[in-house]
Every structure is written in structure tokens, then in C-alpha cells.
Amino acid sequence: MASVDLEKLRTTGAGKAIGVLTSGGDAQGMNAAVRAVTRMGIYVGAKVFLIYEGYEGLVEGGENIKQANWLSVSNIIQLGGTVIGSARCKAFTTREGRRAAAYNLVQRGITNLCVIGGDGSLTGANIFRSEWGSLLEELVSEGKISEGTAQTYSHLNIAGLVGSIDNDFCGTDMTIGTDSALHRIMEVIDAITTTAQSHQRTFVLEVMGRHCGYLALVSALASGADWLFIPEAPPEDGWENFMCERLGETRSRGSRLNIIIIAEGAIDRNGKPISSRYVKDLVVQRLGFDTRVTVLGHVQRGGTPSAFDRILSSKMGMEAVMALLEATPDTPACVVSLSGNQSVRLPLMECVQMTKEVQKAMDEKRFDEAIQLRGGSFENNWNIYKLLSHQKISKEKTNFSLAILNVGAPAAGMNAAVRSAVRSGISQGHTVYVVHDGFEGLAKNQVQEVSWHDVAGWLGRGGSMLGTKRTLPKGFMEKIVENIRLHNIHALLVIGGFEAYEGVLQLVEARGRYEELCIVMCVIPATISNNVPGTDFSLGSDTAVNAAMESCDRIKQSASGTKRRVFIVETMGGYCGYLATVTGIAVGADAAYVFEDPFNIQDLKANVEHMTEKMKTEIQRGLVLRNEKCHEHYTTEFLYNLYSSEGKGVFDCRTNVLGHLQQGGAPTPFDRNYGTKLGVKAIIWMSEKLRAVYRNGRVFANASDSACVIGLQKKVVAFSPVTELKKDTDFEHRMPREQWWLNLRLMLKMLAHYRISMADYVSGELEHVTRRTLSIETGF
């Protein structure tokens, strides 16, 4: 379905009925998925039924299966858990139970089932599907349904969404709930860090994941933990000595805390469990450190879903409905999943098979294979963790020196990138300098050499510890060149926003005049606006979306209490509408006005009328987002006046400008990890380039590929020369000419009930799992 026109789509679901249920352990984001499936189903003209209490409700029927309308799923996107309930069900594992379930579905004409749950729930759904024909035959012979009914509903379609905080399902990069669980873990680690530092303590943290170490691995990366235990990679024999040596070493270097992260399913080489108690006693006996154990438990399943989980679930929920509509008796039951930032469909049983293979490999002690089978994302995380945790200060120095600076406005994750870049540089033997206050600081010679321990504890700090300025190098080129010569700098790593990219472009264009600028340069895009060309995501935008989303959740709550109130919220981002659009999806906004999607007075009129209609229903609140520069005349004040006067007597209006709140507090797990990875990746690339351009005792780099922007593009991390990106950049509005996230706007409008054409909806292709699906961290 590359494109379908609106009228046709409005009826593609006509006469079809979709049932949606959540099963197994709950996960944050399930509600967003239920909401998206329900609304997309209604949008295409199908009937949608909510099945309460998972498979138990399916078997028992009656009041547990209710037809939903548009408002049934209003105001649930921000809630954790699942509002339709979930239960582990014994009855469904028996044939009688499944026969009862089939009867309950046929009674309501439901032949499409969307199951949101873990691998057990999805396997159950597939068994149900394969038995469907024979179950109906049994119902006919029992006289419960007629032959004709069995003919009409002869086929059951299944689409699965994986809801599991463990991220233990093969074929999908991220499962629903994983990112939120990481948020909970990082909140706890940040809180524990302060108490551990006060008392010089060691903490052993036990995180969930019986058979899968994903949460433990990623939180260890994002917190800079000293030691990690995961089931996929049991420690070598004699690990007790290595661990105690490492802990003693970091203490003697001046660290006041040690963090050890252990997955609940951690084992040693012989398959014997390693318990958090055992690790604690070991540290106390061998080192005499004051040690505490904290078991995180079900805290990890709780709380509000993160922005990533809300958007992921919404996207996958819509895709699941499309998959059900396009299913035929010959297509396999599918799982809708994410690969990079693209939705794909995978055959359900291939995924389940792969997931079983991992467990089998672990049982048979083929641990390296288990890590490979987990998929690209897991393996990359593991490799980068090993690289960072085993890095040492190099004994041998190279002749190279590099400088790191922050440019633009503060963005979360900058410090994580600086930390990993500094340590990677030092471990490769380079001399590493940091520059305070951006290009201006480079001109004023605010340059200092940095040591391993100077960046300790930077990972979880928000903002910019180096200090950052927006000034471009053009004004003081002479001074900058003089200081590059003075410190003999061979490479520049610039971490920052649009100014960082523009600044490096100016330096490259001045190479003809100054030989000193013929050095290796790399830009790590870091800005809440996500407006730097050469990457799909810039560092700090995930934190910004979460910050804006939390504010909007509170604003929505205020509007719900006041009744008949519309809030107009202004987001940052310059001309780039990324923040407004993505936050809009995450909070279920009624509209988001952005510069890239031009709107006129007709559109505004339609939106106000939509709002007036909405106030006649039981949802008496509205939320409209507006990017700060979406229109020169239709300002926030103009919108406020328009909505106020048009809504007179129906609703009243308030405005809220979020401002610098959006820069966020502590970085989100995504930004910590993304920053860490880009820092390492950039240094590896710069070292290779330096060795390649080193001639007769000096560095001379003037090729276009020696000054690049590093970024995530679809599924791979790529380096794009700044000179080549120039043609793809709209300098007047400071953003890329092409933006991938514009297709998300369709989702925003559909889920807010606008009559729009689906001609632009591109559905996910069916892929196969055996082609090791690459992922967000590919290439590390």
C-alpha cells in the first residue's frame, strides 16, 4: 500500500472487526498502542473491540469484550500500565479455552486480533490462529454456530506488538516499555549516586531481565558503571579477582563511588546463578568497602511512559491495523517492529524461533553466539561497553593532539559525548585539550589539557560543563588560527547545534588562506531543535521532547480539571518543527503548527471549529502546540486572540510558553548512550583520518572528507562531509531541506481526528529476521 486515496481508505476497514488485547506483564506505552489501534481502526471504518483482562477476558467473553468508540481511549496516552488490564491465563493454554475464545470472537464478527504482549502471548496468538479452522468445525458440530457463520469467518488474522520492558524479542530494536524502564533505572541511579558519593559507598544494583541483559547493559553504559553481570556474557573464571582489582583501582584514582549492575538472571560460566548478595559479600570481604544492595524490582514497570515509548507505540499501533487490513489467508501472522527509525513487519514465528534460539545458545554455553542472535543493537551496545570499560590510559603517546569544544545552546548529552571522546582520545595515546566557551574561547585561548579523571561523573550531567557560545569563527579567524598553531592542534571535535556545523563549514572554506586549518574536523550534532543536516537525531532532542511532554501532561491535567479550556503551548526549535510535532504525538495534541507544513486562515478556522465540536463531547479540553517561528503573522498571541474570540461562550483559552525548560534537566538514557557512542565513534574515525593524512612528521588534511558531520541516518551511523551537506541546507531558516519526520505529521493529525488523505501513508515492508536486522547503533 504505497498510497491509497482517502475515500477508498475510509472504507478499507468497512465490515471488518478488530479486537485488541494486552497480555502478559504490563509495560509502559501499552495504552498508547491501544489508543492508536482503536483510533486507526475507527479511522478506516472498522469496528474496534477492547478485550479486557487479556486472554482471560477473551475466554470468558461477556462484558469483557466491549465495542470502543473514539472517546474510549481519550486521555490514556500518558498513563503507565494498561487500562484494559492484563492477566496470565491458564484456560487459554487448553483447547477448550481456545474454543470458548473462538466462539466469543465469532459472535461479534471479530476476525482480526491485535495482541500487545511478550513472546509467550504472541506464540499463544499464533497457535490460536493455526487452530482457528478446526475450532470453528468443533463449534459447528456442537451446534453452537451455523455452517454459514463458520464460512463467513473462516480466517483469523493476527498482528502482534511486542510489549516487554526486557527488550528480549528478536527482530525488533526496541520493544514497548524498554525506554521507560531505562528512565526509571537512570532516575534511581542518579539518586543513589548522590548518597554513594557522600559516604564513599559501593552499590550493587539488581535490575530486571531474567533471561535478557538488555536493561542491565544499557543502564551500565548510561551510568558509567564499574562492573556488569548479564546472562548472555558470563564473566571469565577468576572474575572475582579482576572485579576487586578494578574497584580498588577506581577508588585509588579518587572516585568516591562504585556502581555494580547485575541482571536478575546473571550466571557464571557453569550456568550457576550469581546473586547480588554474593557480589556484595565479596566486595566487603576482599576490599572492606561499605557496600549496599538495591533491588529495583517492579519500580521498573511503573511510572509514565517516556516520549519514545508513546511515539513508538502509536506508530506501531497504526502499522498493526494496516497489517491486519492487508492480511490474506496466505500471509503469515506478523509482528510490527522497529528497525532504526523505520517500521517493518516481521513474520511472528520467525521472531519467536530466533528468540528461542538465543535461550538455547545460552543453555548450551554458546555465549558469543547468543550475543549475535540478540541482534545488531545488543551486540553494538556490548562491544562499546567492553571498549569503554576496558579502556586504560595508554602508555604510548602518539604525536597527535586534538581539541574538543561545545558550540551553540546547551543540550543534554553534550557532557556524555565530551567524556567518552576525552577518554577514548587518551586511551589511544593522543593529547586531548578542551576549549571553554566555543569558538570564542578558542580565539581567547581558553584551552587546557584534560586528564582521564577530569571528566568523571559527567555522563549524567545536563547542559554543557565546558560552557558554550553561539559565536561563529568568521569574526576572529586570525586568533583561532593562532591558537591552533600555538597548541599544535591536529584535530577539532565540535559538539553543538547548527552553529557547530556552520562554524566548521567556515573553517573548511578558510583552508585556502590558512594552512593551519588543514586539520581533521568532526561535528557531533547536539541541539534540542534537531535541525542539523546529516543526521536524523541530534543529541539533546530526546531530552527536550521528554521535558516538553512532561510540561504538556501537567497542562492537560489542568485543562481537564477546569473543563472547556484550550491551552496554546509554544515550543522552541527555531524554524524547525520537530519538537512541536513529536511532542504533539506524545501528548495527544489537537494540532501542532509548524513552519514546514504551511497553514493558512482556512486551516486555523477548521481547527477552531473542530475544537468547538469537541467541546460538545465529554472531552472538554484542548491542547494546541505552536512552534516559535511557524508563521511570522500567526503568532502565539494571534492564535490566543483567535481561539478566544471564536470560542466565546464555548471554551476559554490560555497560553503557555515553555521556553528554556525544554533544555531539560538530567539527560534521558537515549541521549546519554547516543552521546557516549558518538563520542567514541568520532574519535575512532578521527584517529584513522589522522594516520591517513600524516606525512613527513605533519598533518595535512584538505580533502572534503576530512571535515564531517557524524549522525544516524535511517539505520546506520554515517559521516557526511560538511561541504557536501551545504547544498542540502536551508541557511536562511537554519535547517535541512529534507526532513524525515514530516511523515509523522500524518499520524499526529489522524490520531487527533482530522479528515485527511492517507495518500502519503507509507506502510512497513515485510522483512525477514534471518537478515540480522540492523539497528540504531549500527556500525559501532
Swiss-Prot record:
Query: CDD domains, from UniProt?
Result: Eukaryotic_PFK
At which positions is ATP bound?
25, 88-89, 118-121
Disulphide bridges: none
Using the record for this protein, list the coiled-coil segments as residue ranges, or answer none. Answer: none
Q: Where is this region: C-terminal regulatory PFK domain 2?
A: 401-780
Location, primary (coarse class)? cytoplasm
Q: Which GO terms describe its molecular function?
A: 6-phosphofructokinase activity; ATP binding; fructose binding; fructose-6-phosphate binding; identical protein binding; kinase binding; metal ion binding
Its annotated pathway reads: Carbohydrate degradation; glycolysis; D-glyceraldehyde 3-phosphate and glycerone phosphate from D-glucose: step 3/4
Name the positions where beta-D-fructose 2,6-bisphosphate binds: 470, 527-531, 565, 572-574, 628, 654, 660-663, 734
Entry-listed glycosylation sites = 529
Entry's Gene Ontology BP terms: canonical glycolysis; fructose 1,6-bisphosphate metabolic process; fructose 6-phosphate metabolic process; glycolytic process; negative regulation of insulin secretion; response to glucose
Keywords carried by this UniProt record: Acetylation, Allosteric enzyme, ATP-binding, Cytoplasm, Glycolysis, Glycoprotein, Kinase, Magnesium, Metal-binding, Nucleotide-binding, Phosphoprotein, Transferase
Q: What family does the Swiss-Prot or TrEMBL record give for this protein? A: Belongs to the phosphofructokinase type A (PFKA) family. ATP-dependent PFK group I subfamily. Eukaryotic two domain clade 'E' sub-subfamily.
Q: What HAMAP family does its record include? A: Phosphofructokinase_I_E
Protein name, as recorded:
ATP-dependent 6-phosphofructokinase, liver type
Task: Say which species the protein is native to.
Answer: Bos taurus
